[in-house]
């Protein structure tokens, strides 16, 4: 079964709820429904925007989906500032990003924490987008493939094959995020192919063949076509370009195999 590409727009800490509504409307207007047969498109807004996005998506019966940028490892309770998976599920979220390099870097999240978050997401029927990726020093040392596989193993440790089948993996080389530097399509394929081979070891070839592996890091309408043409790159986790409705729609159309809207 061919894997359907996924284009997920990570808005990071940008846009209030009114701006969120305007952007989703723009994407929906710019990307006709026919494209959604060939590509899944998701937006990942800040927590405070999710209810507004939900109302718009459900009210207008839009085909794009949405998710959250993080989730708590806890079910509920005295954890000030935390947001639980059950709350996100109630808001109709499909996806939740876990282990993004900015969370790992600024909030010191390790693989065990990322695993805990992925488990909570799965418990509540959410699809975790598990992020892994190396810094420039690792890339220059030439140990990037093993580094990523180690992160992958740590972030999926103990999950059953059935659980791994419900996960999306995002490979984001840290040196390419927001820097304008993009890993070449061959670089992306090298690591994404290694990720799929490792998934086959962890969960069997059948599961590995169905898990979507995304590339993230300065993805835009100019480079997405070459990236998703790689055999093991099944879409993209898009940052800055996802804040521009027209570009995000164009990017999604390219991932669907065109023509441009």
From Swiss-Prot:
It catalyses: D-glyceraldehyde 3-phosphate = dihydroxyacetone phosphate. Substrate binds at residues 10-12, 178, 218, 239-240. The keyword Ribonucleoprotein does not apply. Its EC number is 5.3.1.1. It comes from the Bacteria. One of its GO terms (biological process) is gluconeogenesis. It is found in: Cytoplasm. Keywords: Cytoplasm, Gluconeogenesis, Glycolysis, Isomerase. PROSITE patterns: TIM_1 (PS00171), TIM_2 (PS51440). The active site is at 100 (electrophile), 172 (proton acceptor). GO terms for cellular component: cytosol. GO terms for molecular function: triose-phosphate isomerase activity. It holds the Pfam family TIM. Pathway: Carbohydrate biosynthesis; gluconeogenesis; Carbohydrate degradation; glycolysis; D-glyceraldehyde 3-phosphate from glycerone phosphate: step 1/1. It is an enzyme of class 5 (isomerase). NCBIfam families: tim. Homodimer. Belongs to the triosephosphate isomerase family. Involved in the gluconeogenesis. Catalyzes stereospecifically the conversion of dihydroxyacetone phosphate (DHAP) to D-glyceraldehyde-3-phosphate (G3P). This is Triosephosphate isomerase. It comes from Nocardia farcinica (strain IFM 10152). The lineage of its organism: Bacteria, Bacillati, Actinomycetota, Actinomycetes, Mycobacteriales.
